[in-house]
Amino acid sequence: SSGKTTLTLHAVANAPRLGGSVAFIDAEHALDPEYAKKLGVDIDSLILSQPDNGEQALEIVDMLVRSGALDLIVIDSVAALVPRAEIEGEMGDSHVGLQARLMSQALRKITSALNQSKTTAIFINQLREKIGVMFGSPETTT
């Protein structure tokens, strides 16, 4: 609720005006097309993907970057990039570090592709409060 998505939607709205092509990876499945239109986003020219899991989202990002066809890719949000194993697993199963490993591996691959392209990628993340923190900042990313 601090305006991260709104800020990126302004970038998404401006890129086509400058001749750029844009993709929005809506991992949260929460993009409001009407709100985006009010901010100036051309929904008809926007490449929109609502992937089923983290692996699918990151594979789409990698493919789009390697295509060289886009100027901007927004991924909303890192916290919603849930690994396939966690989605398909049983309630209560331990998936310690699974998302961190997925992100680490994918970012190495995507960063390499980004370095060889003209594409900008914006990954949105969320701050959460750590429960029971006595010292230091209680905020953490997920």
Curated annotation (Swiss-Prot):
Keywords: ATP-binding, Cytoplasm, DNA damage, DNA recombination, DNA repair, DNA-binding, Nucleotide-binding, SOS response
A GO MF term: ATP-dependent DNA damage sensor activity
Keyword Transferase belongs to the record: no
InterPro entries cross-referenced by the UniProt entry: DNA_recomb/repair_RecA (IPR013765), P-loop_NTPase (IPR027417), RecA-like_N (IPR049428), RecA_ATP-bd (IPR020588)
Keyword Cytoplasm: yes
Localization: Cytoplasm
Gene3D superfamilies (alphabetical): P-loop containing nucleotide triphosphate hydrolases
GO terms (BP aspect): DNA recombination; DNA repair; SOS response
Residues engaged in binding ATP: 1-5
GO cellular component terms, A-Z: cytosol
PANTHER family: MITOCHONDRIAL DNA REPAIR PROTEIN RECA HOMOLOG-RELATED (PTHR45900:SF1), RECA (PTHR45900)
Function: Can catalyze the hydrolysis of ATP in the presence of single-stranded DNA, the ATP-dependent uptake of single-stranded DNA by duplex DNA, and the ATP-dependent hybridization of homologous single-stranded DNAs. It interacts with LexA causing its activation and leading to its autocatalytic cleavage.
Protein family per UniProt: Belongs to the RecA family.
Identification of the protein by name: Protein RecA
Species this protein is from: Streptantibioticus cattleyicolor (Streptomyces cattleya)
Gene: recA
